[in-house]
């Protein structure tokens, strides 16, 4: 299941500036074109609130999100969105928390410590850098796991262990 080492890919990317950062910029990008009136200002300031509101409204418009749907900006990229989903969706079903690196362990800790779900949580863990037996998870439980363990260098190679007829939610 785990990729513990790495080998050089056979072809190099045309532009190596991709990943979680630095990211490849759009054609014609120039840092001097960025507005700086919010630099050093809190998101709670008048200008910060205005800028966030504009970004949210623009997002709704560009993505054609229905008027009666809510849209928001969540900090911390995927981590913030994952936490938001956990806090709003976990609870009705038992939880299988699968972790083998720091993000997954943090999400398990939040489910127990902050959400108080310890009585309905089963842990599937393995030493740092290896995967637990993911096939042992229950199709009727919600599952928490990190698909690409960036802190440990271990990723799940496939999702064959997730049942096609599952009734629980899958968080990854």
Range-by-range predicted roles:
Residues 32-84, 100-110:
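Conserved N-terminal alpha-helix of the aminotransferase class I/II PLP-enzyme fold
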Residues 67-69, 116-121, 166:
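A short helix-to-beta-strand connector/capping loop
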Residues 18, 71-75, 97, 122-123, ...:
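General beta-strand structural signal in soluble alpha/beta enzymes
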Residues 80, 88-143:
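PLP-dependent aminotransferase-like
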Residues 127-172:
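Active-site phosphate-binding strand-loop segment of PLP-dependent enzymes
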Residues 1-46:
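N-terminal "arm"/small-domain region of PLP-dependent enzymes with the aminotransferase-like
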Residues 9-10, 64-66, 89-90, 135-138, ...:
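Solvent-exposed alpha-helices and their adjacent loops that cap or buttress functional pockets
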Residues 84-85, 110, 156-161:
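A short acidic, amphipathic alpha-helical/loop segment
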